[in-house]
Amino acid sequence: MDNSIFYSLGNGIKFNKNKYKKEIGIFNGITSHELDKQTKTNNKVHFFKNTTPSTPVISKKDNIKQKKEEEEDNDNDNEESKEDDDFVEDDDNDDDDDDDDEDEENEEPKEKEFIKHQVNNDEEEEDITLFNKSNENENSDDSDDSDDSGKNKNKNKNKKVSKETQEDKHKREIATFRNKHRIKVDGTDIPDPMTEFSQLENRFKVRKYLLNNINEIGYKEPSPIQMQVIPILLKEREVVAIAPTGSGKTASFSIPILQALYEPKKEGFRSVIIAPTRELAQQIYRNFRLLSKGKPFRICVLSKNLHNQSTNENLIKNYDILITTPLRLVYLIKENLLSLNKVEYLVFDEADKLFDKNFQEQVDIVVTACQNPKLKICLFSATMNQQVEELGHSIMKNPIKIIIGEQNAAAITVDQKLIYVGKEEGKLLAVRQLIQKGLEPPILIFTQSKERAHDLFQELIFDGINVDVIHSERTQFQRDTIVKKFRMGKIWVLICTELMARGMDFKGVNFVINFDFPHTLASYIHRIGRTGRAGRPGVAYTLYTDADTPMLPTIVHAMKQSGSHVPDWMLNLKVQGKKKQQYRLKGVERESFSTIPLSERTSSKFKLRKNKKSFNLPGDQQKSNENNNNNNNNNNDNKKRKSFNNNGEKNNNPERKQKQIKKPKKII
């Protein structure tokens, strides 16, 4: 009997076959003596005789032939087994009686009938298997066709299973890669991240000049934000990206924009990048210049000179990329001096600041001015609250949200430390002690106001330190020269306000000192983010007094979240919600820390400008004209009053001083 009855148990299983072969041999009439000889040679045999795991498909004709051959073999085996049995019985029972021989002769035909009947049953059992269909066609050709169709179905199933397993495996690999780099994504149809810049050429067909510029700048491996944002923008999707300071957000949108614009065209602005400060706009401009080297893209930063030249339409059409602050752009839009109908990419850098209450109206004007149906809006920032996200989603189409690390968290590369100074007078002493310890410049010091920045400047300038101060009241020429000197190392310590807290990339800054405690968590994160950029380590010191306790728990939890050491008692501090809200809105009225007399504090070189120049928007022109007319009327009234003496008599020269010149006496 064939051993096909065991084929359904599984592939490649090894077992002791003696137990099963004895039972089969008994039914086939094989003696136990012959079975023992066979089992000595092969105690353990592979489950299948054939090495191939797949069983051949046999048609009905082949089955009939095999059955006939098996019947003949079984008959021969039965005859041989009978002869063996007779020979054994004769040897063993030589002393038996003749009656026993007669009984054996009578029993032989019965055994033959039993064996034949058993073989026929085995042949019937061989026709039935566990995997055969119950209903079979009568024609052998039909059965062969059905077998072929079954094979094809199994192959298709295997292919589907293999495809599904490959897709699942790919998804698992992408998920582990994102978890490794702390990339969190939210959206639909999210492209896979890239692992190397070399994939830009094969996967996205990025132009060679861009790849060469990336190598020349020194970008070896993409940062986590670049790994995910660049593929998304190259697939022409909108994005909301939240990543720590110094993580490479500018390059993540500069590379896809240059690839999408392809080449310079004289069609007007096709990409607009909006930044909250002019210093940040200048920095983005430099980044675009480095990446666009080799292609004559016309990139400009909106300035007063361009304001004056904006009436020339041909000049504006020559530009491809515009980088600006929102106020200047809104002025040109309201004056109908600028068209944004060709804009394909609108990027808001430091979006949480631009979507603040002070900028919301300006942002709405810019968005409504961009009428291109292919417009794609992108938001980038290190911090972003829920309100800003909702405003962003209201003007975007199915954006993808990306978070690197934890949302609204400080950079891991910055070692954050708190220093208690008691009162305001202790801050100046703490700064001098830190500098004496050997803090390596360049150093950034943040204050909450321009006046306090001036006072600190005048205190440190007499300590023999190359120090300077920058804020919004300085002229544009002064601000540009100060930033340039600070980058070149001519200025060691730069005192600044919130103007320099956002987006500025000073690669060599080793230390940041928060002279005044920040009012919000976002301000704290952006301040300390001026150090520890691009993977380099940095240190941030924050000075605090008793008046800063309402905001202290928030900063402490941010430090703990980013891995900095914080005492346990600070984590257990509890502050009333009203005090915290008042601190955020009103701040703290701080006492003066200066040791210089009040009359000698202000310097003529850094004197604050009283008449601040600003751009009058078209809607504000009537108010300004009315104010000017009122001022002119008041001046005329004053002139009329001065033209009369106290006695009511007219003065011939009212503008001169009313000193009467004595005429010389006539000599007779």
Curated annotation (Swiss-Prot):
Subcellular location per the Swiss-Prot or TrEMBL entry: Nucleus, Nucleolus
Gene3D superfamilies (alphabetical): P-loop containing nucleotide triphosphate hydrolases (3.40.50.300)
Annotated ATP binding sites: 243-250
Domain Helicase C-terminal: residue ranges: 413-574
Ranges of biased composition (kind: Basic residues): 604-613, 659-668
Biased composition (Acidic residues): 70-108, 138-147
Record field: compositional bias (Low complexity): 624-636
Region named Disordered: 37-174, 601-668
Cellular component GO terms held in the UniProt record: nucleolus
UniProt signal peptide: none
Molecular function as annotated in GO: ATP binding; ATP hydrolysis activity; ATP-dependent activity, acting on RNA; RNA binding; RNA helicase activity
UniProt-listed PROSITE patterns: DEAD_ATP_HELICASE, HELICASE_ATP_BIND_1, HELICASE_CTER, Q_MOTIF
Basic and acidic residues: bias regions: 59-69, 109-120, 161-174
Keyword Endoplasmic reticulum applies: no
Catalysed transformations (reactions): ATP + H2O = ADP + phosphate + H(+)
GO biological process, one term: maturation of SSU-rRNA
Function: ATP-binding RNA helicase which may be involved in the ribosome biogenesis.
UniProt record similarity statement: Belongs to the DEAD box helicase family. DDX52/ROK1 subfamily.
Protein's recorded name: Probable ATP-dependent RNA helicase ddx52
Organism of derivation: Dictyostelium discoideum (Social amoeba)
Gene that specifies this protein: ddx52
